[in-house]
Structure formats: C-alpha cells, structure tokens
C-alpha cells in the first residue's frame, strides 16, 4: 500500500500527509491504510478548490487556464494539510475578517463566496452513516458538510453541493479510479475491512522489527500502469504557491 500511495499521489500531497501523521505520532510505513486515506482526503480538498475563483464583482467563476490580467481570488481557502497551529491561525484570521462563527474543530476549507467553513468527508462506507457521524461530531449548523464515497455517491448539508456538476464529477472519477487500481493490486479489501486492515498492520509491524535501523533505498520511478493515475488537476503556478504557503515555515 505504501508503494502504491507514493506512486499514485502528487509528491506534495504525500509530503503534507507524512508531516500530518508524524505530528500525531503516526508512522506512514506502518499505518499504510491511514496513509492512503489521508492522502485521498487531502487530494479531494485540493480538487474541490482548484480552478474556482471569485472575480472583482464577487462572482464565482471557473478558470482552467489562468489569465494573469484577471483580478481573481481563490474561492476556497485550504485549511486541511497545515499543521495545527497554522490551521488555527488561518481559521482565526478568517473569523476576525468575515465575522463568521469560530468552529470547535479545524475545518477543511473556507468558502469565500458562501461565507462558510466546509468539512469534506471521503468514506469507504455508506454516505448517510458517515454524514451523520460528521454532523454529530461537529454539532454546528454553520459548518457545511460534503461527503464523497468511492462508489460515486455524495451527500451534502441541505443537498447544497457547492460545486458545479462537472467539478464534482472530476472528484468522483478520481476516487473511483483509486478504488479500481487498489482492487487490481489486491489492496482494496484491507482498505475497507477493519479486521483485514488490523491483520495487515500487525504484518507491517512485524516486518519492520528486524531491520528498523537499516538504511532503505527508495525508487521514485512510476510504473507505466500508474502513469494514468498521475493527478492532472493542479497547475504549476498553483502547486508552487501552495508549496510555498504550506512548507515555508518548516525551515528555521
């Protein structure tokens, strides 16, 4: 699973996920299913935001090839993927600027058009069940919830799906592709079955014990079969801006 994740996802997604897991004392090499789940969730958050802007009249527009002369602002602020301190700093800044109610938990996005925080969910289970779990945890009508599944289903607060149908279809297609590729490699069952995942976790722990201190050699080559999985949703300018925004505070 770890090899699949590193080949399947954008390197920046992988890097941010590793930092997030280490912040909570988790090891991507051991908890590989969680590694895959967090990478998937983070990519969906980026896809949700990509190409969506607000123009000088505060109207929402979609731009896939940037016009440098256009006065555009990204419609969504991406909060997911930042360390906790920086995430709360962004949330507090948004609340102070807009006057919206501060959430109890760190949300994933902020929508400048609708003036609301958004909680994104990606589930391997039934969307209604996961939606209720999210709603019960958040306990706030102010935070909008949008759930996606690997089977193409979705559910959102008051059936308000925020994005246009084409943008949501890109996300659903990507999730379905990830599912199919996992299944073709025999990874899907352990990804969705907690009992099988627990068995795999024990296996990972056992395999790491004898050689924990040995250096490892990592191959960054992408197999031909996985080249079709390379995410195409992030333009180079957006990637550079996001990398600078998320990672500049790592250096002292």
Curated annotation (Swiss-Prot):
GO molecular function: RNA binding
Site keyed Important for efficient shutoff activity and nuclear localization: positions: 195, 198-199
Keyword entries, A-Z: Decay of host mRNAs by virus, Eukaryotic host gene expression shutoff by virus, Host cytoplasm, Host gene expression shutoff by virus, Host mRNA suppression by virus, Host nucleus, Host-virus interaction
UniProt GO BP: viral RNA genome replication; viral translational frameshifting
Presence of keyword Cell wall biogenesis/degradation: no
Site annotation Important for efficient shutoff activity: residues: 202-203, 206
Pfam families reported for this sequence: Flu_PA
Location in the cell: Host cytoplasm; Host nucleus
Domain of life: Viruses
Chief localisation class: host cell
List of catalytic residues: 80, 108
Function: Plays a major role in the shutoff of the host protein expression by cleaving mRNAs probably via an endonuclease activity. This host shutoff allows the virus to escape from the host antiviral response. Hijacks host RNA splicing machinery to selectively target host RNAs containing introns for destruction. This may explain the preferential degradation of RNAs that have undergone co- or post-transcriptional processing.
Family that this chain belongs to: Belongs to the influenza viruses PA-X family.
Record text about domains: The probable endonuclease active site in the N-terminus and the basic amino acid cluster in the C-terminus are important for the shutoff activity. The C-terminus acts as a nuclear localization signal. The C-terminus is recruited to host protein complexes involved in nuclear Pol II RNA processing.
Protein name: Protein PA-X
Organism: Influenza A virus (strain A/Chicken/Hong Kong/96.1/2002 H5N1 genotype Y)
